[in-house]
């Protein structure tokens, strides 16, 4: 049955792969631009971040085809450079950015960005599932538009989320993620930044995560350290929402 996305009758069919940029107008409304130089996808995750330090937010999109206009076998991890005010903030695809073309199996939070090595450029952390489970860390090559995959031995998980955050207050970004791993359906891992390009698995024994859900970091109790909130499904499809202080 034909159906249309509410509010987008002239732009988007619900089964269509989409890429819509909503630009704010002065009167508080938005102008919707279909495709807008962006790759249409389904099962999409997108993150704005400034990869080249020009003070314009760039865009990273993960997704796949939906067997409507694009084969579902085709996966995308695509980087777009914001061309700034001289080009009306139009986005231009960055060729050969270095990301492996695969996506995660859920709709959760498989991308995080942050400067893990203190070089002043924002790096990218990605969870994906393509011929196995993967947690991939990509080093920003000085804002050139190239990202270099780092050889770090993470215990991979999928169907969950990844986060950068300073877990031990040493001023360096650590890594936390939850999801379904090859060992357990309720993986929750913490990797501490060793300040030399490597990470150490220092996961406390009491941490239990979830799949088909999300985990996030926040200082809930105001003690100056990040806490972990994990939500999703566990064994036997139990609904879980643990908080770790």
Q: Where in the sequence are the language-model features?
A:
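Solenoidal tandem-repeat scaffolds enriched in leucines and small polar residues
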Residues: 64, 106-112, 127-129, 159-164, ...
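Blade-edge motifs of beta-propeller repeat domains
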Residues: 15, 20-41, 80-106, 138-157, ...
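Beta-propeller blade termini
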Residues: 1-4, 44-53, 108-118, 160-167, ...
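Glycine-aliphatic tripeptides that mark coil-to-beta-strand junctions in extracellular
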Residues: 1-9, 55-61, 120-124, 171-177, ...
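Hydrophobic strand positions within the blades of repeat-based beta-sheet folds
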Residues: 21, 59, 79, 124, ...
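Short glycine/acidic-enriched loop and turn motifs that connect beta-strands
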Residues: 13-15, 65-69, 130-132, 180-184, ...
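Structural signal for beta-propeller blades
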Residues: 18-20, 68, 77, 133-135, ...
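Intrinsically disordered, low-complexity linker/propeptide segments enriched in Ser/Thr/Gly/Pro
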Residues: 1-14, 18-25, 60, 125, ...
């Amino acid at each position: 049955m034909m159906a249309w996305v509410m509010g987008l009758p002239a732009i988007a069919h619900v089964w269509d792969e989409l890429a819509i940029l909503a630009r704010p107008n002065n009167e508080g409304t938005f102008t919707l631009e279909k495709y807008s130089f962006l790759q249409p996808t389904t099962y999409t995750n997108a993150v704005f971040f400034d990869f080249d330090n020009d003070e314009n937010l760039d865009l990273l999109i993960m997704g796949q085809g939906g067997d409507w206009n694009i084969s579902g076998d085709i996966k995308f991890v695509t980087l777009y450079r914001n061309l700034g005010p001289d080009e009306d903030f139009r986005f231009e695809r960055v060729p050969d950015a270095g990301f492996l073309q695969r996506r995660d199996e859920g709709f959760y939070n498989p991308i995080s960005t942050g400067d893990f090595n203190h070089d002043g450029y924002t790096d990218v952390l990605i969870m994906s599932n393509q011929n196995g489970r993967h947690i991939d860390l990509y080093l920003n090559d000085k804002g050139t538009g190239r990202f270099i995959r780092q050889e770090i031995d993470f215990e991979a998980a999928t169907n969950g989320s990844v986060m950068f955050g300073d877990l031990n207050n040493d001023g360096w970004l650590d890594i936390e993620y939850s999801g379904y791993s090859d060992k357990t359906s309720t993986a929750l891992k913490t990797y501490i930044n060793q300040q030399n390009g490597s990470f150490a698995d220092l996961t406390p024994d009491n941490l239990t995560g979830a799949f088909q859900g999300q985990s996030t970091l926040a200082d809930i109790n105001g003690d100056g350290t990040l806490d972990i909130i994990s939500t999703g499904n566990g064994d036997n499809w139990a609904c879980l929402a643990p908080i770790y202080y």
